[in-house]
Amino acid sequence: MWRGSSAGGSQGAAMEGTGGELGGQGNWGLEDAPGLLARASLPIMPAWPLPLASSALTLLLGALTSLFLWYCYRLGSQDMQALGTGSRAGAVGGRPGGCSEAGRPSPGRSGESGEGPRTEGLMSRRLRAYARRYSWAGMGRVRRAAQGGPSPGGGPGVLGIQRPGLLFLPDLPSAPFVPREAQRHDVELLESSFPAILRDFGAVSWDFSGTTPPPRGWSPPLAPGCYQLLLYQAGRCQPSNCRRCPGAYRALRGLRSFMSANTFGNAGFSVLLPGARLEGRCGPTNARVRCHLGLKIPPGCELVVGGEPQCWAEGHCLLVDDSFLYTVAHNGSPEDGPRVVFIVDLWHPNVAGAERQALDFVFAPDP
């Protein structure tokens, strides 16, 4: 141990004593420095007892965790409220203005966008809720659709004749009539089920005279001469109608592209009486394709979609993109009887699987 000293030893004696304080008297060396420094720092920063510091840190972390969980709960509650009120806010149907070809009423005038900015904001909130639960992967087109909303008037559609009322998914191939090969499996399944579906219609049919109320299961006419019996309405199964139409329900269960869990999805019988006409309408979205299976097609019936005329054929399917302006008419005589088709909403073949999942979440039917 190094000690301070002087030639006569008097300096060493002066350093000896009983005190150990820095600057006082006593024996000290290099090994005593840590203790001296610690004692010197006590008046500046008193050390907390270890148990007390640990308890304070635990309480702080607990408070931060509780605050984070509360924030997540509030955020999730707002999203679920938006999801719960979406379709009740007119998310799909728009304003009732006439009878669409199977399903909820289409907008009263072509291009009418229903809720406008309110619907656009609701869709964006739902999409963010979906992304938080799953992922944004593959959501480019859906995000653009949510940000842009439907096109009023002649916006992003083809030459202004494609005007979906609610959802316009960009970059989808567009044509008024879709080739059968695009949905070959579902088309062939429905056509092979034609006899069973026709029998089901005979079992639930009535005289359509208009002098008596429609029987159970049939919707009241939303336009003169237009009647519907739906097995699926806005993505919700109608159990009583499905039990009355087992052949049609079995065919629906075998389809691969049926929009069965989406408010854009409908399926059922559509009846048009002689003299009835539905003109200048557009469906709510270009993300679907409507499959028309002809059941009873008398002379004088016509379907014009996007300016292109077509006609149904009994036992055969016609694929229609009803986001284009369309007109349906029965110009036959009363003796010809009604025109009857079985209509099913299928996914557009170019909507990817991830996009379908997201749109099913965003446009989920009411519970």
Curated annotation (Swiss-Prot):
Regions crossing the membrane: 50-72
GO MF term list: dioxygenase activity
Phosphoserine carried by residues: 106
InterPro entries documented for this protein: Asp/Arg/Pro-Hydrxlase, Asp/Asn_beta-hydroxylase, IPNS-like_sf
Record localization: Membrane
Annotated region described as Disordered, given as residue ranges: 1-27, 88-122
Membrane topology reported for the UniProt record: Single-pass type II membrane protein
Enzyme class, broadest EC rank: oxidoreductase
Pfam families, per the entry: Asp_Arg_Hydrox (PF05118)
Stretches of the chain found on the membrane's Cytoplasmic side: 1-49
Alphabetized UniProt keyword annotations: Dioxygenase, Membrane, Oxidoreductase, Phosphoprotein, Signal-anchor, Transmembrane, Transmembrane helix
Enzyme nomenclature, EC number: 1.14.11.-
PANTHER family: ASPARTATE BETA-HYDROXYLASE DOMAIN-CONTAINING PROTEIN 1, ASPARTATE BETA-HYDROXYLASE DOMAIN-CONTAINING PROTEIN 2
Name of the protein in its database record: Aspartate beta-hydroxylase domain-containing protein 1
Source species: Bos taurus
Gene name as annotated: ASPHD1
